[in-house]
Amino acid sequence: MRVYAGIDVGGTKVALGLFGEDKTLLGKAKFPADPSLTGEAFFRRIVEVLQSKMEELGLPWEQLQGVGVGLPCMIRYPQGQVVLCAMLPALNGFPVKECLEKLLPGVQVEVDNDGHCAALAESRHGAGRGRQHMLFCPVSTGLSSGIILDGKLFRGSNGFAGESGHTLVTPGAGIPCGCGNQGCIQS
C-alpha cells in the first residue's frame, strides 16, 4: 500500500494526516509548533512525529510515497523556500523542500502556502468542487486566502496572491505585524 502525508503547519500547532491511495485517512497527529526551533530542527521534529505515527499504525516507512506541506508563510513555489513567515520567523528564508527531501530520500515533497493548499483542496474535494472560480479565506491564528480562477490556483505575478492577512488597512498605524509592517489586517 502507498501512503501519503499531509502536513498543516500553523502558527501554534502542526497537524498531520496519513492517507492511503484511496484517500482514506489512516491516522493523524497534532502537536505544538515550537517557534524557538531552527528551520532544520523544526522539520526534523515533524519527520520524527511522522515516523512515530507510521510505526504506531504498523505502516512500513518504505510505503511513504509523498508529503505535502502547507505553511502560514510566503513561499517561493515550486522551490518550496520560505520567503517570509510572520508566525514562525525562524523559518524566514529556509529551504523547506530541500530540507525535507534530505530527511525523506525517495519521497516526493511539495511545499506551499497553507491558504493555497486549502483552496486547492476545497476546490477539488469540498464545497468548491465543480466551480471554476472560488475564493477561500481560512481564519486561524492568522488570516490567509487562496484564489481559484478558471479551475486553477492563481498565484499572481510574484507568487504571493492571496496573502490577505498582510493587506495594509491602516498603513503605519495599529499593532505591529510579525511581517514587519504596521497596520496589516491580520494584526
Q: Regions from the language model: what does each represent?
A:
Residues 3-48, 81-84, 159:
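Short glycine-rich, Thr/Ser-proximal phosphate-binding strand/loop in the N-terminal lobe
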Residues 8-10, 20, 76, 114, ...:
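Acidic active-site catalytic centers that drive phospho-/nucleotidyl reactions
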Residues 12, 72-75, 140-142:
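Short glycine-rich anion-binding loops that position phosphate/pyrophosphate groups of nucleotides
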Residues 17-19, 27-29, 38-41, 103-104, ...:
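Glycine/GP-enriched mid-protein hinge/lid loop-to-helix segment characteristic of carbohydrate kinases
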